[in-house]
Amino acid sequence: MVTAAFLFVSGNSAEALCIKTKKANLRKGPGVKHEKLWEVLKYMPLQKVARKGAWYKVKDLDGDIYWAHQKLFTKKFKCAVIKQDKTNLRTGPGTKHKPVEWSPVDKYFSMKVMRVKNNWVEVMDAAGDKAWVHRPLIWIR
């Protein structure tokens, strides 16, 4: 675990970013004339791998590459995204806690990281609803 964290920090110029706007278009190339490949929602975490002017080349949890304008991102907080469909979000940190009313959620559901307690992460969605999720079930950047 320590090694993975070290590699992320010391590896090339990869940088953790979060979508800060309600919606964001991820494109095939750097510019609005390039095809829109995916529209993501607030708090989607991405990893910056390159830059061309005001455009960032980014990688998602699946390793797919896109381009997005720098004004769509923030580094002020960490974000997380669900890695698989039908993932339970809970009222507290542990399986003894009940799932929240809006659980389960599917892959690509994005959230802001609030805090970590052992192997559980408290998250908040774009509507301001909070829940807990088991750390191995999310990709955090």
What is each PLM-predicted segment?
Residues 1-8:
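Bacterial N-terminal signal peptides
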Residues 8-16:
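Sec/Tat signal peptide C-region and signal peptidase I cleavage site
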Residues 17-22, 30-38, 45-52, 59-88, ...:
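Boundary regions of SH3-family modules and the immediately adjacent low-complexity/disordered segments
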Residues 35-52, 96-117:
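Conserved beta-strand/loop element in small beta-rich adapter and peptidoglycan-binding domains
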